[in-house]
């Protein structure tokens, strides 16, 4: 697989603002591609709109869809990636056991120097060049898939509007109460006003 700059965008919860951030980053990173990872379960329908009713796609092998014809649908996360200017979009539909194979297959299709990957679980299988963990300051709860990859975090990103200093203060109070260890204990915290700095940093890693 050709080496690409991989920026992972994970999230504390399903509605933390991951997709919004991916789209904001795509607008500032012309030529980058995007990957959406969807973990499905047979006969189940999750809160993620993409995960809902994907069970017909699940099989012995991961399903990878690429290109506008296969991945664009208005209102869906992959459609939003296209609207934000992604050079290409890849959608990997996998079971829990197929996450590693699915992300490898999706990344093998990337032709751009950089790619944004939305999701948490794939980080147990692929080393990203930079991992942003998105959280809402008013909802600082960690779902299991996020907690399992905190040791991969490069930085936290606080989504939503509001005073940046207050958002950081709220987050730091939570971080102190959680007694986090490893990279998550002192990883830098970004807010929307820091997007230009993040974009500049990502441009340098390609």
For the regions a language model picked out, list residue spans one by one.
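Short, well-ordered secondary-structure micro-motifs
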Residues: 45-47, 102, 127, 144
């Amino acid at each position: 697989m050709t080496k690409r700059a991989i920026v992972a965008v994970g999230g504390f919860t399903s509605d933390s603002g991951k997709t919004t951030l991916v789209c904001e980053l795509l607008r500032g990173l012309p030529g980058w591609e995007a990957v959406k990872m969807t973990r499905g379960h047979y006969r189940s329908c999750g809160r993620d709109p993409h995960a809902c009713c994907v069970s017909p796609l699940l099989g012995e092998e991961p399903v990878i869809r690429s290109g506008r014809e296969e991945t664009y649908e208005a209102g869906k996360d992959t459609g939003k990636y296209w609207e934000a200017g992604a050079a290409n979009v890849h959608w990997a539909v996998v079971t829990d056991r197929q996450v590693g194979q699915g992300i490898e297959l999706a990344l093998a299709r990337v032709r751009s120097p950089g790619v944004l990957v939305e999701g948490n679980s794939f980080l147990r299988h692929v080393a990203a060049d930079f991992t942003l963990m998105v959280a809402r300051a008013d909802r600082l709860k960690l779902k299991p898939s996020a907690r399992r990859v905190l040791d991969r975090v490069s930085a936290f990103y606080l989504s939503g509007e509001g005073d940046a200093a207050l958002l950081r203060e709220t987050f730091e109070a939570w971080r102190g109460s959680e007694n986090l260890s490893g990279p998550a204990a002192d990883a830098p915290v970004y807010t929307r006003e820091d997007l230009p700095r993040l974009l500049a940093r990502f441009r340098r890693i390609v």
